[in-house]
Amino acid sequence: MPEYKLQAPYTPKGDQPAAIKGLVGGVNDGEKFQTLLGATGTGKTFTIANLIAQTGRPALVLAHNKTLAAQLCNELREFFPDNAVEYFISYYDYYQPEAYVPVSDTYIAKTSSINEEIDMLRHSATRSLFERDDVIVVASISCIYGLGIPSEYLKASVKFQVGQSIDLRSCLRSLVSNQYTRNDIEISRGRFRVRGDVLEIGPAYDDRLVRLELFGDEVESISYVDPTTGEILNKLDSINIYPAKHFVTPKDRLDSAIKAIKKELKDRLEFLNQEGKLLEAQRLEQRTIYDLEMLKEVGYCNGVENYARHLSGREPGSAPECLIDYFPKDWLLLIDESHVTCPQLRAMYNGDQARKKVLIDHGFRLPSAADNRPLKDIEFWNKAKQTVFISATPGDWELSQSTKNIVEQVIRPTGVLDPLVEVRPTHGQVDDLLFEIRKRASKNQRILVTTLTKRMAEDLTDYLSENKIRVRYLHSEIHSIERIEIIQDLRLGEYDVLVGVNLLREGLDLPEVSLVVILDADKEGFLRAQRSLIQTIGRAARHVEGLALLYADKMTDSMAKAISETERRREIQNIYNIEHGITPKPAGKKASNSILSFLEISRRLNQDGSTDDFVDIADKLIEHSAKDSDSGVSLESLPELIEKLESKMKIKAKDLDFETAAILRDRIKKLRHRLVGR
């Protein structure tokens, strides 16, 4: 059993010990599904950390977006500094999938931009899963997409040991077949070089170089080396060099795949010609023959993923192998905000197939392209051995699967109660709202107001602004970095009120918010359903004076259930506080300098700031990230910042300003260490 060393400045409190005991017992008893029904701010992540530590299982923590994944990864790295906590999200900075619009006869080619830093983290995750047992991978939904064949990936790895006799030419051929490229001038990730009796490799999973010093045919020493200074960082007895890409296809399998593609093409052309689809048949034949020539000559073609079924030797309709298949047999799945994440799992396959069907029907792709896909819902659950759903408002499906294995956690370690809930009539609601906002703002507290439509949110924002209220409006067209910036400005007191349609129902903590206002609470629908109301009310659950105002003229079933559940939790919390003599105290961290530095980063990334600005931003982030990881957004921003700094460094080196280039190089090194958790 792997040993997890949980490090925390506090011990489980409230109903955390009972929740931990219940979940650990369920895992040890082999329960397939459990649910942690934890109210906002009760320390669900700490409970999960204890569960992982006590069961000793490799764990996959699934979040529904990369911001929450970054937040969870940061928190778990704090709890497990000596264990492997990896971050696995989509490596695309930009992705436009291949598509065809029949109505306008428009073909859209696939275009994408891969973030090399995130690709490194993905390789780091799979490497840890092969080499360690104490591994926690925090992933987004991208983990259900194909990721090569684990057995082939492992088989293709090249192992070096001190004292081992090797044939250097054979090793170099192995590296090339594993998609490393030789570059004796500039070495980086995915490259290698040979200088005399020294072989240096930039492994796909690390920002450090691996140096092998040879004496004749014998490996004399192996060491990690700083890629810019050449300084030896530490010596090794042995090392595995894994392929530069997760998709590894041996020569014999490639030959078999080409034959299978030719056969499928022949069958498909016969079908299209019989159907009288001559244009589609000609289009498909031209594209596929060109792709086959490319595969035969260079082993690669544009859109090679569409032939994934043939290249991996899978049967038609069979499930692709993904990140889950890199885990050992005895692993644990933890799904955060399961009421959002589980529907995502179901939606991914259907959306992908709808787009592929159009491409196949119109002769752009062979039918086998449909098998380059994410996992189906049933395939995912067949691979998952034991699952814990985590949510303040679990969905009906999660609850039905867990049946009796539902563990509740409603008591906050801080003693803060769920907010009071008041229902007020809509007549005169705007003036009443204005009064409540001024009252809270005078105490330096923050307010969230949620409306049903964008137009209503805009009009309300304008009205509040005219009445001298410091207010901002959040809507769906705001990009993620600016969205985080607006949220943190709220925390920092740049303004007092945030108005929006679907405001932060899950995830980010806002301990400064004491008032949540829900307009048109009696309009039944997705945004005013029971779970949505509970999640929105929960945004005020971290403040001692938390209050939720629902403006409505009638009591809907959803409102009644949400209010009843909030009052039930509040009563449990109050009784516990009285019995244990607990006085509620403010929850959460204050927005700190690490957040401020992130805001500077996001602003500078949207304009081409000076080199000094970027160095200053990097210095602030390095200084504060060591002390405070806050909400995890800094982790999410690092790949983009590193790319900017590298671009600046190359420009300075080209201009012969080596002093500034060296300063930038040092900052990049420190930021990369922060990114991989070292």
Swiss-Prot record:
GO terms for molecular function: ATP binding; ATP hydrolysis activity; DNA binding; excinuclease ABC activity. A motif (Beta-hairpin) lies at residues 91-114. GO terms for cellular component: cytoplasm; excinuclease repair complex. The keyword Glycosyltransferase does not apply. It holds the Pfam family UVR. Residues 25-412 form the Helicase ATP-binding domain. It comes from the Bacteria. Keywords: ATP-binding, Cytoplasm, DNA damage, DNA excision, DNA repair, Excision nuclease, Nucleotide-binding, SOS response. Residues 639-674 form the UVR domain. InterPro entries: Helicase/UvrB_N (IPR006935), Helicase_ATP-bd (IPR014001), Helicase_C-like (IPR001650), P-loop_NTPase (IPR027417), UVR_dom (IPR001943), UVR_dom_sf (IPR036876), UvrB (IPR004807), UvrB_inter (IPR041471). It is found in: Cytoplasm. The UvrABC repair system catalyzes the recognition and processing of DNA lesions. A damage recognition complex composed of 2 UvrA and 2 UvrB subunits scans DNA for abnormalities. Upon binding of the UvrA(2)B(2) complex to a putative damaged site, the DNA wraps around one UvrB monomer. DNA wrap is dependent on ATP binding by UvrB and probably causes local melting of the DNA helix, facilitating insertion of UvrB beta-hairpin between the DNA strands. Then UvrB probes one DNA strand for the presence of a lesion. HAMAP family: UvrB. This is UvrABC system protein B.
